[in-house]
Structures are given as structure tokens and as C-alpha cells.
């Protein structure tokens, strides 16, 4: 039965790390217990039969294939197609002849059906090129799907549709619904990661530029890594969930044996209990978060380093400097900052929460073991959102009632369910993704709240005794800053680069205005240019935005480009039947870009105004040093 040639070629093509599990299971499969097959005189006439009830997969394999091929003519421009069920594989082999189709992603629960299809057909070339991706049911989880959707590209999420291979797979309805829910959640997470508000992006850019003098006059992230990487094996990340309170006595006992990273909101709580963290982290840009540092703990702050994202609110810096706290500004990997050549001061992706940031820093500093405490990501039984002593507790009144039974998830330890929220669900899923691909061992010792998949659940006391009992007290080296001459040199380089980018932005805006006028003339019957010419000019604008030279604009324009262009996706994918259809589609395509270009112009104008003010502290710094 086995076509050695096809199967072996396909198996070799499943060579990537992601296929390790599937490849091994296919190699170990010695006999078919659930399914068999029949083949007619025609090579396309392959049917599959379930042994238990003799149910056929196809009533007529060739007729069903013809019907499917006719149906998928409307999907000729789609770069990605998703299917549940491998079937006999023939449909996919034919669809892959369309070079516009970049990937087919197949989800299959039955290992034997994957085995059969890989025997029937040679998919080796498409598997090697990644044009065909096979996902066995046992290997599907959130981190895996996150990786798949990153591979696909964001702008085609709106075209996502899970096609069922044929009626045979209706028996897997429950599995299909679960899978579809997982995929939709992954798409939603990716959209949220892009951000949906250019105002947030603008605030981040403005505050980053405003904070530049403080960044270059303090130690760099590179200095931190070079002096302190690998000094300690174990990091404890302290978050502010309701379960934190019960862990504080044990944390105090072992604080000198591990590196303590704490969230900005847990810092006042630790200070109150006399537990000194090594690092206090802050990620968010909002003014209200700065209030976590509006305090004075005197000598307690000695030797603590505050690791804050470079886009934090200016009040954060004021509070840190008021009490002479040591701090480092670390650049998030945003396009505007990356274009300034400040690699020594970055970069962190930071996830979406301060705990994600702390986790990334702990991993980058070489900790082999990372322990999470206070990471509930769920409401307490009494509806509390955070630990006792959380300074913003009043802002969460009514949250429990709002979210009740909407976002419930598996409890820590796997016993029952706990109530969560939409944002905590997203935070948990990001953590699960981080942990799944981390080189460190991650222990969740929260002993409450939600289960975080991939993290090892263990009592905090037991783990401290195992990992920390006989450890010596940690010792950290002091960090150095650039000398004044180097600070001025770097500051001048940044200043000139920002000014250059502001001029590029101004010229780009002028080009956008020209195209805006062309579209306006077209829609008002005054067009001097053909549809093709206007469309080419729109394409030139998009090409410039994808050029490395204009990468700095991706941050302010990113949310708008992502969301507006995802709305354009269905129009882009629409199949063209004839010349009239082509002209109608081209007109609709151009007209649909009018609001996008209008938004681009408005955002560039606002950014220019705000940058002129935000750059003043850097300008003042350089003028005082007589560099300008």
C-alpha cells in the first residue's frame, strides 16, 4: 500500500523543528487501525473509508473535487487558505498550482488521514517551501497558532475563513468550533498588539523624545547586561495580584538569595513590608502610572535600580530624580526609536504588561529559573482585583461585576475555574507564548488565580527551599555612564537624526497631498490622470512607507495603516471577471484610499507639531554644552 517514494519524500520535507512531533508519530505508524481506502481507475478517484462503520469520506470523489474547484475559483487571489481536514489531499495539490496562493494551512485531527494523504501525493516541494503547513490536532495550542499567524502576515486576517474539507468532517464539529475560537482569539490578540489608537503612538513618541537627555546621561541597557548578566541563577518577578499578600513573608526571607524584579505597582507594597527589590520595572506611558513613584522611602531605595521604558510620562522621571533614585531608560523596539541608532539603550519588546517586561529582562540577564508570584491574572473569590496596598484599587470598582462569567478560565492547579477579564486573558496568553519559547525554566508560584500554561506550578516555599536555601547573597557590580563628551556627541547625533526625519516627513506629506488632490479630482469628475496612473501613485506612497528610510513613520502611522488596510483586504482579494469588472474594482480601490491618505496627512501634521516641542529639552541640553 505504501508509496515509499511519496511518503519518504514528504517525510524528509517535514524537516523543521515545528514538525518534530508529527514526523516521529508518522514514522512510528505501522498499521492503519481506523481508516482504509479504495482507488478507482482514475488517479483522482481515491476514497477513504472509516473501518468502524464503513462510512465513505466522499460519495463521488471526482464530482466532489470538480465542485470544490469551481467553488474555489472565487478565492483565486487569496494568498492564504485555511482548511479543516486533509481528505485525500488531491484538492490541495491542485489549488497549490495557483502561484498567487502563498500558503495552505491544514488542520487535521486524525493522524492516519495525514499518513494516507502523504502516501497518495508528493507534497515535498510545497512542504519545503512552507506553502503547505500541516497542523496535527495534538500539536495545536496558542503559542503554535501565534507563530502561524505571524508567518501569514497581518493584513489578511480579515480574509480568515476556516473551510471544511468535506461533509465527512461534520462529525468533528466540536473540535472545529474550538479551533476556530482559538484562531479568532489569536487574530484578536495580534490586532490588539498593533494598537488601535494613533494617539497612544504619538504620546509614546513625544515622551520618548522628551526623555532623551535623561536617557543618555544614565547607564545604558547594554551596560546593565554587560555588568550583571549571569550573576544570579534565579529571578523572582513580583506582581500585584490578590495572592501576593500571602507570599510576602517567604519573599522577605529569601530576598537576598535571588534577583527580585517587581512591578511598579508592587514597589510601594514591598517597601511597606521592608522587602528590597533589585529592580523596579515600569512599562506604561500614562501619567497615572507615575504615581507609583510619588513617594519617599529614604534609604530603602539605596542600590535599587528602576528600569523604566523610555516612553514613560515625564512625571515618572521627576519623581525618580526628586528622591535621587538610580534609573535606566530602556527603549522599546518601536520604529521611531530604532531609526535613531541607539542600540546600546535597547531594545525590549516588553509584551503588554509590566510583568511581561520584567520577564523579558530577567531572561535577558541570564536567569535560568524565573519564579512568578502575585501573577493571578484573575479576580479573587471576593472580587478583589489586586493585592492589599495597591494604590489604584478604586479605579477597578465594578470590574468584577462587569466581567462575571465572561472570561472564566482554568484555575491555578487545574481545580475548577476562576473569573478573569479580557485584558488579563490577553496578558496570560502573551505569557504562555513567552514561556513556551523561553530558554529559562518558568515556575508559577502564585498559588492562586489563573493557570498559566507552560509554566511549572509549584508551592513557593518548596521551590525556595530547593533553589535558594544554600545560595550565597547576591552581589552586583556598579554601572557606569558615558562621560560628558560622549553624552554630547551622542545627543547631537540624535538631534540631527530627528531633525532630518522631520524634514523627510514634511516632504512625504507633500507627496500625499498631491495624490489626495488626484483622488479628489477623480471622485468629482475632474480627473486629468487615468485610473492606472492614480493607482500607481498610491502604490508609490506605500512603497516609500515600506522603505527603510521611512521606517520611523511606521510607529505613528502603524495603527491606522493596519486597520484601514485590513478593511481594504476583501476588495483587494475580489476576483476580476472581465475588463469592466477590472475598471470598477480599480475605481473602488482608489476611492477607498481617500480616507487613508487623509488620515496619514493629519497624523504627520500633528506629529510634526508635537516633535517641535518634545525636542526642546534635548536642544536645551546641547545648547548648555555649547554643541549647538
What are these regions (language model features)?
Residues 437-628:
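Long, compositionally biased charged/polar accessory segments in the mid-to-C-terminal portions
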Residues 400-449:
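Polyanion-binding loop/helix "lid" in catalytic or ligand-binding cores
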Residues 181-233, 244:
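Aromatic- and Gly/Pro-rich donor/ligand-binding loops
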Residues 114-197, 271-357, 361-365, 570-628:
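Acidic/Gly/His-enriched mid-domain segments of enzyme catalytic cores or analogous surface patches
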Residues 1-80, 88-94, 201-225:
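Class I S-adenosylmethionine
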Residues 123-127, 283-286, 294-302, 387-406, ...:
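Acidic, Ser/Thr-rich peripheral helices and adjacent loops at domain boundaries
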Residues 266-267, 274-284, 362-386:
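Glycine-rich phosphate/pyrophosphate-binding loops
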Residues 80-135:
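SAM cofactor-binding core of SAM-dependent methyltransferases
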Amino acid at each position: 500500500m505504501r508509496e515509499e517514494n511519496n511518503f519518504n519524500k514528504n517525510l524528509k520535507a517535514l524537516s523543521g523543528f515545528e514538525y518534530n512531533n508529527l514526523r516521529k508519530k508518522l514514522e512510528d505508524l505501522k498499521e492503519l487501525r481506523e481508516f482504509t481506502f479504495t482507488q478507482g481507475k482514475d488517479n483522482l478517484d481515491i476514497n477513504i473509508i472509516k473501518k468502524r462503520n464503513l462510512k465513505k469520506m466522499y460519495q463521488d470523489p471526482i464530482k466532489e473535487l470538480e465542485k470544490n474547484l469551481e467553488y474555489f475559483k472565487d478565492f483565486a487571489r487569496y494568498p492564504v487558505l485555511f482548511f479543516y481536514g486533509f481528505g485525500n489531499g488531491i484538492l490541495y495539490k491542485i489549488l497549490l498550482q495557483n502561484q498567487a496562493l502563498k500558503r495552505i494551512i491544514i488542520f487535521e485531527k486524525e493522524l492516519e488521514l495525514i499518513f494516507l494523504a502523504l502516501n497518495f501525493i508528493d507534497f515535498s516541494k510545497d512542504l519545503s517551501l512552507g506553502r503547505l503547513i500541516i497542523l496535527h490536532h495534538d500539536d495545536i495550542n496558542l503559542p503554535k497558532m501565534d507563530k502561524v499567524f505571524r508567518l501569514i502576515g497581518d493584513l489578511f486576517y480579515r480574509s480568515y475563513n476556516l473551510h471544511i474539507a468535506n461533509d465527512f468532517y461534520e462529525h468533528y464539529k466540536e473540535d472545529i468550533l474550538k479551533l476556530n475560537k482559538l484562531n479568532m482569539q489569536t487574530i484578536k490578540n495580534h490586532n490588539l498588539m498593533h494598537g488601535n489608537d494613533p494617539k497612544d503612538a504619538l504620546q509614546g513618541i513625544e515622551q520618548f523624545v522628551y526623555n532623551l537627555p535623561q536617557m543618555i546621561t544614565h547607564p545604558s541597557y547594554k551596560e546593565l547586561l554587560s555588568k550583571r548578566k549571569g550573576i544570579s541563577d534565579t529571578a523572582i518577578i513580583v506582581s500585584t495580584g490578590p495572592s501576593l499578600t500571602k507570599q510576602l513573608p517567604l519573599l522577605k526571607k529569601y530576598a537576598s538569595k535571588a534577583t527580585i524584579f517587581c512591578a511598579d505597582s508592587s514597589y510601594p507594597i514591598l517597601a511597606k513590608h521592608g522587602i528590597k527589590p533589585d529592580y523596579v520595572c515600569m512599562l506604561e506611558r500614562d501619567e497615572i502610572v507615575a504615581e507609583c513613584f510619588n513617594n519617599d522611602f529614604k534609604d530603602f531605595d539605596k542600590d535599587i535600580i528602576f528600569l523604566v521604558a523610555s516612553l514613560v510620562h515625564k512625571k515618572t522621571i521627576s519623581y525618580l530624580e526628586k528622591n535621587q533614585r538610580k534609573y535606566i531608560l530602556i527603549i522599546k523596539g518601536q520604529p521611531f526609536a530604532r531609526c535613531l541608532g541607539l542600540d546600546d539603550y535597547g531594545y525590549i519588546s516588553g509584551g503588554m504588561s509590566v510583568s511581561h517586561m520584567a520577564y523579558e529582562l530577567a531572561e535577558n540577564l541570564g536567569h535560568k529559573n524565573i519564579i512568578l508570584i502575585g501573577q493571578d491574572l484573575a479576580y479573587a473569590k471576593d472580587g478583589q482585583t489586586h493585592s492589599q496596598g495597591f494604590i489604584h484599587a478604586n479605579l477597578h470598582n465594578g470590574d468584577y461585576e462587569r466581567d462575571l462569567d465572561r472570561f472564566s478560565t482554568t484555575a491555578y492547579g487545574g481545580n475548577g475555574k476562576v473569573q478573569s477579564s479580557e485584558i488579563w486573558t490577553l496578558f496570560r496568553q502573551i505569557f504562555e507564548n513567552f514561556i513556551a519559547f523561553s530558554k529559562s525554566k518558568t515556575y508559577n508560584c502564585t498559588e492562586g488565580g489563573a493557570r498559566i500554561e507552560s509554566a511549572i506550578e509549584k508551592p513557593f516555599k518548596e521551590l525556595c527551599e530547593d533553589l535558594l536555601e544554600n545560595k550565597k547573597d547576591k552581589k552586583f557590580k556598579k554601572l557606569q555612564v558615558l562621560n560628558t563628551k560622549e553624552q554630547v556627541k551622542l545627543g547631537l547625533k540624535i538631534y540631527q537624526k530627528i531633525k532630518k526625519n522631520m524634514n523627510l516627513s514634511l516632504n512625504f506629506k507633500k507627496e500625499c497631498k498631491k495624490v489626495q488632490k488626484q483622488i479628489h479630482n477623480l471622485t468629482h469628475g475632474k480627473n486629468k490622470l487615468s485610473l492606472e496612473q492614480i493607482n500607481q501613485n498610491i502604490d508609490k506612497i506605500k512603497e516609500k512607507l515600506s522603505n527603510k528610510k521611512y521606517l520611523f513613520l511606521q510607529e505613528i502611522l502603524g495603527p491606522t495603516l493596519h486597520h484601514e488596510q485590513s478593511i481594504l483586504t476583501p476588495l483587494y482579494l475580489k476576483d476580476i471577471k472581465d475588463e469592466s469588472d477590472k475598471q470598477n474594482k480599480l475605481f473602488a480601490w482608489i476611492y477607498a484610499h481617500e480616507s487613508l491618505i487623509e488620515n496619514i496627512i493629519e497624523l504627520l501634521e500633528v506629529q510634526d507639531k508635537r516633535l517641535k516641542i518634545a525636542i526642546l529639552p534635548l536642544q536645551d541640553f546641547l545648547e548648555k554644552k555649547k554643541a549647538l
